[in-house]
């Protein structure tokens, strides 16, 4: 999300007014640019950061957070497994009904399986998107079309956010996955 209003709208649509957990995988415009606003607005109970900068360090002094290259956390009936190295940054979110694999820094992500695959900008080595029920590409508009073409040629059921709008994914306890494009 590149606008706090998009996050607020998504939270309002499910009747949520606070966050249990905020993951900040790394300091970059696409992954942490709204972190301070989100922390201030939604007061997450727990924050996990793969890395920080001076601005983030300042606010995290007063928050319940952990700076770690890996974590295995259970919150609100969901399980998050997170790992970052100099080659990759991934999270596996286990929810009732489905598992989502989120690849923040693509390089090599072997043996990672799930129902939903969320990618940033490139397809990492070691992942077969056709093995997922849904693939979402979060990339800039100029990069999205080339990567989308590759994903579609591999047989992936794929959506892109870059230049096309945000995607809402709802996972039901039955395992049914509903994907909607948000205005």
Describe the residue ranges of each PLM region:
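Non-globular, low-confidence helical/coil segments that flank catalytic cores
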Residues: 1-183
């Amino acid at each position: 999300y590149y606008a706090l209003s998009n996050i607020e709208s998504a939270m309002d649509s499910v009747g949520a007014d606070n966050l249990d957990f905020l993951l900040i995988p790394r300091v970059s415009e696409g992954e942490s640019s709204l972190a301070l606003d989100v922390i201030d607005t939604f007061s997450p109970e727990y924050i996990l950061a793969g890395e920080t900068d001076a601005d983030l360090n300042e606010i995290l002094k007063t928050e319940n957070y952990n700076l770690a290259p890996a974590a295995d956390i259970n919150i609100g009936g969901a399980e998050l497994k997170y790992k970052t190295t100099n080659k990759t940054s991934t999270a596996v979110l286990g929810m009732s009904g489905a598992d989502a694999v989120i690849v923040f820094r693509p390089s090599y992500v072997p043996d990672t399986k799930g129902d939903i695959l969320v990618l940033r900008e490139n397809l990492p080595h070691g992942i077969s998107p056709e093995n997922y029920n849904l693939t979402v590409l979060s990339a800039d508009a100029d990069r999205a079309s080339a990567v989308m073409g590759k994903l579609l040629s591999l047989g992936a059921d794929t959506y892109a956010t870059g230049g096309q709008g945000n995607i809402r994914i709802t996972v039901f306890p039955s395992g049914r996955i509903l994907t909607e494009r948000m205005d």
